[in-house]
């Protein structure tokens, strides 16, 4: 792979297998160019490889950077321009800073300048993280602190977006986003908590306590034998998604607090034992209804079940940027039952999306309906659940797409 990166790069600094004119809003191909730059930079500083301090690799990096700085690729989706690309290239810029020419460094700072303070929830955290990397390139200690304070300002509960009082996570309105934005939130906070540990910018115990409680009272419930529940994946239904997202959460939980918080370590140990330990029975047993997300989890020693609903308060699921284009019915009472954890692994290409488990829908050969905007799509408030911690009941009145039902 690395040989290909080096040998195939054109004189202009472009790779022949990347479509630089790509207009997709998701999976934007030019970002691969940025990812390869970061990969090469990491390799350049890796003593474990023959490419350590390689002049050939360094030359390739400079040429690839020059192409990006010269052509200035722009995606139709703002996320890549302000978050995705600066997040990837920012890491490369910082690692490669000593090798950057003054012209390259100026261009690098310009790329990072695409990120501005603003937004909410995880988008706000991503943007502030990118600004912090720009501040490091500029040796601006005050801006680093401002960015850090902006990041930790989201470690609270009860906002419209972010960590909710029921320990679910919302983004794009009142919409459960455990496996998408919420996972990025935990991953990012874990990273920053380690970076700042032992410094004047370190997270305090209250902040670490909120994040570890999100894992303890939120994420532990939606994972079963190293897989994340299908209904928590959001619109990201890609290959092996339940496995990859569970692993990402496990790594983030393990590193939260830089190994200095007893509470974080305890929560991480429980999560790891439940999902990756050799245990005959699941120790986390009970019934939990995430009342702000219309989402129910029931756990027994040998199995787990989930129910995902929507109401006039809660958005069921989103379809956007080409993702989840068949997910119209995914929150109409979808019910998944797990025993070994692999029951629904990679089933997505084979599913009849009108016959998801627990869903009531009209049978039709017409294309699946697509709704582009994130808004509540079940015209009733009678949706919810009750629980005593061990047992519970969930109920849903369906009134959408011509169907009325009580579930």
What do the predicted segments below correspond to?
Residues 3-232:
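Aromatic-lined, polymer-binding surfaces characteristic
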Residues 258-407:
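Catalytic and substrate-binding regions of extracellular carbohydrate-active enzymes
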Residues 88-95, 234-254, 357-369:
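A short, hydrophobic/aromatic-rich structural module that often spans a beta strand
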């Amino acid at each position: 792979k690395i040989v290909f990166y080096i040998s195939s790069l054109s004189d202009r600094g472009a790779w022949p297998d990347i479509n630089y004119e790509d207009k997709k809003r998701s999976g934007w191909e030019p970002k691969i160019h940025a990812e390869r730059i970061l990969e090469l930079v990491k390799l350049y500083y890796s003593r474990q490889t023959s490419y350590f301090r390689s002049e050939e690799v360094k030359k390739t990096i400079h040429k690839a950077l020059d192409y990006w700085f010269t052509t200035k690729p722009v995606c139709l989706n703002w996320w890549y321009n302000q978050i995705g690309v600066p997040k990837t290239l920012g890491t490369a810029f910082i690692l490669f800073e000593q090798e950057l020419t003054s012209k390259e460094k100026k261009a690098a700072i310009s790329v990072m300048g695409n990120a501005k303070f603003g937004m909410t929830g995880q988008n706000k955290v991503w943007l502030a993280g990118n600004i912090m990397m720009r501040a490091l390139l500029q040796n601006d200690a005050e801006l680093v602190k401002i960015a850090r304070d902006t990041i930790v300002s989201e470690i609270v509960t009860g906002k419209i977006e972010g960590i909710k009082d029921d320990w679910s996570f919302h983004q794009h309105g009142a919409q459960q986003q455990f496996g998408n934005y919420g996972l990025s939130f935990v991953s990012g906070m874990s990273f920053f908590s380690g970076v700042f540990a032992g410094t004047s910018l370190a997270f305090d115990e209250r902040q670490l306590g909120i994040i570890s409680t999100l894992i303890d009272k939120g994420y532990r419930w939606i994972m079963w034998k190293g897989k994340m529940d299908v209904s928590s994946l959001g619109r990201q239904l890609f290959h092996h998604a339940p496995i990859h997202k569970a692993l990402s959460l496990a790594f983030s939980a393990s590193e939260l607090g830089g190994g200095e918080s007893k509470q974080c370590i305890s929560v991480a140990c429980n999560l790891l034992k439940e999902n990756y330990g050799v245990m005959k029975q699941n120790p986390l047993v009970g019934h939990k209804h995430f009342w702000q997300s219309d989402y129910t989890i029931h756990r027994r020693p040998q199995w787990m079940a989930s129910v995902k609903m929507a109401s006039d308060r809660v958005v069921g699921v989103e379809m956007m940027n080409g993702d989840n284009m068949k997910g119209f019915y995914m929150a109409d009472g979808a019910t998944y039952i797990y025993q070994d954890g692999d029951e629904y692994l990679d089933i997505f290409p084979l599913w009849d999306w009108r016959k998801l488990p627990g869903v009531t829908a009209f049978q039709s050969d017409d294309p699946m309906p697509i709704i582009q905007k994130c808004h509540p799509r079940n015209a009733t408030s009678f949706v919810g659940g009750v629980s005593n911690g061990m047992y519970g009941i969930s109920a849903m009145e369906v009134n959408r797409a011509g169907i009325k039902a009580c579930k």
